[in-house]
Amino acid sequence: KKSNCIAVGGPYSNNLVGLAQILNEYQIKKKFLLIENNRIKMIGNYFLLKLLCKEEELMFINKESYLDAENFACNLDKNTFFIPEGAACVESIAGISTLVFDILKNEKDYQKNWSHWILDAGTGWTAAAVVWLNAYLQLEKKISIIMIAGDANSFQNSLFKVNEYFNLNGFYLSNHVYNFDLHFPTIGKSFGSMPQKIIQYIENFAKNNGILLDPIYSAKTFYTAEHLFGNEKENTLIIHSGGANALHGFVSNFFK
């Protein structure tokens, strides 16, 4: 049994903030490996990480070590559980799969039938689990995935690993016909890019809908969904990864 946790990510990672909260709650020892950033500022998620972590729990590593982070982590401590960037590991699949069952419960509770599910993808693991369960449970939902990061090959790799996980646990598809399509952002196509138009979109969306979006993931998801599927609002569900915390890191981009 591993006694502590080492995770890797960027200094502004949403994933690390959430992970730090859980590990602190359960009193699990941790160390976060952050890729070196010469322009880092005490804003956004990095500010939250500093609140949640002791100085010795945050360690900056160079790009070479970051690319081989698992071996680097194991050399630091053999008795550790390693969590890769974005928690893209098989141990996360059971948890992320609950998303589908939560949605189905909401459909039942609110007497809705969302026939078209739209969600973003970074590492693609959550989206892959949704696609797999849609096939396994024969939900017949149309799944549209907006690839904020990664590409078609990386998503297929995530889907392969998700299928492998379920097979190892005794769950098999009668056939491997997946009902999904991949799309890419129609604005700010490069990961991390923030055109002024998306900043204005976030401001308008907050005022008109009361929902806070971030410029990296959720805003591009909604913007792209509107442009691709604007006429399908009635039975469409957009599943996004939040972003209110991350917004604090982009204050200087707003209200110019």
Over which residues does each language-model region extend?
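Active-site-proximal loop->helix
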Residues: N14-K63, N153-Y165
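A short, small-residue-rich loop immediately preceding and capping a beta-strand
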Residues: K1-I22, Y26-I35, N113-T123, K142, ...
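Short beta-strand segments
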Residues: L33-I35, I61, I83-G86, D120-A121, ...
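Short glycine/serine/threonine-rich phosphate/pyrophosphate-binding segments
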Residues: Y12-L19, T123-V130, A219-F222, A246-L247
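Glycine-rich phosphate/pyrophosphate-binding loop at beta-loop-alpha junctions
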Residues: I93-D181, H240-K256
